[in-house]
Amino acid sequence: MIVIPAIDIIDGKCVRLTQGDYSRVQEYNLDPVQQAKYFEKEGARYLHVVDLDGAKKGSPVNFEVIKRIKESTSLSVECGGGIRDKKTINDYLLAGIDYIILGSVIFKNPEFVEDVLKRFGNERFIASLDFEEGYVKLSGWQEATRISVEEGILHIKKLGFQKLIYTDIKTDGMLKGHNFEAAKYIRSLFDGFLISSGGISSMNDVLKLKDIGVDGVIIGKALYTGHVKLNEIINLV
């Protein structure tokens, strides 16, 4: 199992949201590059980066910061947030970003997604499925849909994704534990590389996900608050 620390960026700063609510923002580091270097020093080999401004706007806002993170570390970086056209994908890949995370565009423009997976290779892309109360949410979690989790995953598989990140918005940033029933359900539906996100509050949460058969776990707020020590959890799993 791989452990992936998370950096979310608003206004060029490292922040965390609570339940995806942009009005409940907490700043943790004015310099995301410095934060990435710290995670690397603690033993991280992977990094999850989201341009939250970009997710809301629908186009990149913090590209230069993310580019500097990649240039300043040897971390394998997966990046998402407002990536909805070929130029943006190309810019990120040319900047050395290892994996591109696609979310809303999967449901809003599936023909485009099918095309870029063929053009650039599906191994460079990760699908992101964000849901609340069993239904998919889009556009930085601001837009509700009536697409069920199962329908969303079937759609993602049909497009040809081999990697999937899922987030239960209700648990995200709450430090109250992960939705393990959702983890089991999604694991049963998706046989590719599965990454869990949202609600991790302890080492025990990570070990439970490992037992379920999840391949990777993204940890955000729990690292910033000290609930989980990155080097300890990496050594444990």
UniProtKB/Swiss-Prot annotation:
Which EC numbers characterise this protein's activity in its record? 5.3.1.16
Q: Where is the active site?
A: D8 (proton acceptor), D130 (proton donor)
Q: According to the UniProt entry, where is the signal peptide?
A: none
Name one molecular function that GO assigns to this entry: 1-(5-phosphoribosyl)-5-[(5-phosphoribosylamino)methylideneamino]imidazole-4-carboxamide isomerase activity
Under the heading InterPro entries, the entry gives: Aldolase_TIM (IPR013785), His_biosynth (IPR006062), HisA_bact_arch (IPR006063), Isoase_HisA-like (IPR044524), Isoase_HisA-like_bact (IPR023016), RibuloseP-bd_barrel (IPR011060)
Q: One Gene Ontology cellular component annotation?
A: cytoplasm
Give the metabolic or biological pathway. Answer: Amino-acid biosynthesis; L-histidine biosynthesis; L-histidine from 5-phospho-alpha-D-ribose 1-diphosphate: step 4/9
One Pfam family of this chain: His_biosynth
Q: Which UniProt keywords apply?
A: Amino-acid biosynthesis, Cytoplasm, Histidine biosynthesis, Isomerase
The entry's localization annotation reads: Cytoplasm
Q: What's any GO biological process attached to this entry?
A: L-histidine biosynthetic process
Per the UniProt entry, the disulfide pairs are none
Enzyme's top EC category:
isomerase
Q: Which reaction does it catalyse?
A: 1-(5-phospho-beta-D-ribosyl)-5-[(5-phospho-beta-D-ribosylamino)methylideneamino]imidazole-4-carboxamide = 5-[(5-phospho-1-deoxy-D-ribulos-1-ylimino)methylamino]-1-(5-phospho-beta-D-ribosyl)imidazole-4-carboxamide
Repeat is among the record's keywords:
no
**Similarity annotation:** Belongs to the HisA/HisF family.
Q: What name is this protein filed under?
A: 1-(5-phosphoribosyl)-5-[(5-phosphoribosylamino)methylideneamino] imidazole-4-carboxamide isomerase
Q: Source species, please?
A: Caldicellulosiruptor saccharolyticus (strain ATCC 43494 / DSM 8903 / Tp8T 6331)
Q: Which gene encodes it?
A: hisA
